[in-house]
Amino acid sequence: MNTQARLTSTQWKARFKGYVQVTKPGIIFGNLISVAGGFLLAAKGDVDLVLMLASLVGLSLVVASGCAINNCIDRDIDAKMQRTCKRVTVTGEIPLSHVLLFGIAIGVLGFGILALFTNALALLFAAIGYVVYVGIYSLYMKRNSVYGTLVGSFSGAVPPVVGYCSVTGQMDMGAVILLLMFSLWQMPHSYAIAIFRFNDYAAAKIPVLPVAEGMAKAKHHIVLYIAVFALVSTMLPLAGYTGTAFMAVTCATSLWWLTMALKGYRQDVDMPRWARQVFGFSIITITALSVTMALDFQAVSQTPLFTLVR
């Protein structure tokens, strides 16, 4: 009896771990930081804790839903990649229908929380990001186009905008800058992953830039996107949304990141190692900027580009 109980307990723990795995906790955590950064930037010190918690929890559930359904969609290509071949949607440890229903359920819950506690604009951005990621990127672009990364970068840039618009209820220049910043950041971040995971992507025939058009072009794009990201990031302090601390942090991190990227042109460069360094510092950069914008906010009055009434 005790042995059977222990076995059942072990099975339940494994099943729970599998459900957590399909939500991609690392992605959720990264998005939590950016949502909080956008929210606190807009709040300017006047923080509604209930609204902030609802924004964080609601969007986390929406992101988790998108990741779970992405696992269902990608199960065939995941089986061909060393990094993903042991996912529960590939091994069958959890039935595909269960993962799909789980993804739908937490998505409905997440959107429900956003609808109840935030506003129409924040909800709209969350919905657009979800549709782009699940419907456009996962179902078609990832498998069929070298521009899949570009399309996916939009959905990756939505979380801080949702956090920002949860507070303001309007689309102003601050929201536009955040959308551009985080979209641009996604590109070198994703291309770096594609380089050090080159064999996986090639095996699954996913047309990411390094596989479809070569390493040299991918390196050019990484350097270009980092340079443009650096310029766009300075727009937050230049437009008066953040102060000198944010300007100092964005200049320092962007310059270091760009210098690191330029090392990829060395003849003796170890490409996978270099790409991992670029990837690792991309996370440091965006985390530092998210934290700094949350703390170094400035009072600025902006005319909304548009507003949605609840």
From Swiss-Prot:
Q: Which GO terms describe its cellular component?
A: plasma membrane
**Single GO MF descriptor:** protoheme IX farnesyltransferase activity
Keyword vocabulary terms for this entry: Cell inner membrane, Cell membrane, Heme biosynthesis, Membrane, Transferase, Transmembrane, Transmembrane helix
Q: What does this protein do?
A: Converts heme B (protoheme IX) to heme O by substitution of the vinyl group on carbon 2 of heme B porphyrin ring with a hydroxyethyl farnesyl side group.
Checking HAMAP family in the record gives: CyoE_CtaB
Species source reads Shewanella sp. (strain MR-7)
- Say which enzyme class the record assigns: transferase
Q: Which PANTHER family match?
A: PROTOHEME IX FARNESYLTRANSFERASE, MITOCHONDRIAL
Q: Which PROSITE patterns does this entry report, sorted A to Z?
A: UBIA
Q: Where are the transmembrane segments?
A: 25-45, 49-69, 98-118, 121-141, 145-165, 176-196, 222-242, 245-265, 277-297
CDD domains annotated for this entry?
PT_UbiA_Cox10
Q: What is this protein called?
A: Protoheme IX farnesyltransferase 2
